[in-house]
């Protein structure tokens, strides 16, 4: 078993910016990342800036989240049972929300947006009938990578009129992702000399986007409550360089 501070350990993070984290604070993550319409004076809503207008006067909401995961895999290879375990532990979100004026609130959050973490190994066995590998022998391929993308958001929410709120936020994304590939040949016949092939990719991400959101309390009384919400991100894709 291994332990790491990265937030992912999956071969699927070999592509793009990796595995996207479930957004939101604990109440929203426990519902699978939904909560655009959630409006509460006691919960920081990171999914919709319009919810910042729900901050009660003379209050300060602070949220700090931690996340830990355990990955375990067991399989049979060539009749032999092999297993691996990996533990991850890191912070998930730091956020706060406070009122600026009556029906006007401000929110801030710092959250991991996506994570990359993998190491896979593949061996191409010796095949004497192959015209190429019959001379080279066995070759081992190792692919590995790690990194993450972090999101910081600052927004305001304003209740324009009764039961209808509008919010806008600025989002900044940054991070580094490193990937490498190594091919190591092992001659079987002892003839010839072969060197390893190494390839590396280093990506840096720095991008600014925006978000606009609305919330409407369609029904709000002592017996029932129905809130409709929507949020839209604008500003393009996260393109690594």
Predicted regions and their residues:
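Outer-membrane beta-barrel porins/channels
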Residues: 2-30, 91-241
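Outer-membrane beta-barrel translocator/receptor signature
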Residues: 26, 38-121
């Amino acid at each position: 078993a291994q332990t790491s501070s990265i937030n992912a350990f999956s071969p699927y993070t070999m592509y793009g910016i990796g595995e996207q984290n479930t957004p939101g604070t604990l109440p929203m993550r426990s519902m699978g990342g939904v909560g655009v319409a959630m409006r509460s004076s006691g919960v920081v809503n990171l999914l919709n800036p319009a919810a910042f207008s729900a901050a009660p006067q003379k209050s300060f909401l602070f949220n700090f989240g931690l996340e830990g995961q355990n990955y375990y895999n067991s399989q049979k290879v060539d009749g032999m049972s092999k297993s691996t375990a990996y533990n991850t532990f890191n912070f998930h979100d730091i956020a706060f929300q406070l009122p600026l004026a009556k029906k006007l609130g401000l929110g801030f959050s710092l959250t991991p947006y996506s994570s990359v973490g993998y190491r896979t190994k593949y061996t191409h066995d010796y095949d004497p009938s192959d015209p190429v590998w019959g001379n080279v022998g066995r070759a081992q391929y190792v692919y590995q990578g790690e990194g993450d993308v972090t999101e910081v958001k600052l927004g305001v929410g304003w209740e324009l009129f009764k039961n209808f709120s509008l919010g806008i936020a600025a989002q900044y994304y940054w991070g580094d992702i490193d990937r490498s590939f190594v091919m190591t040949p092992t001659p079987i016949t002892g003839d010839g000399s072969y060197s390893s092939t190494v390839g590396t990719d280093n990506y840096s991400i720095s991008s600014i986007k925006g978000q606009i959101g609305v919330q409407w309390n369609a029904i709000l009384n002592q017996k029932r409550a129905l809130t409709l919400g929507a949020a839209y991100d604008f500003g393009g894709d996260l393109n690594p360089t």
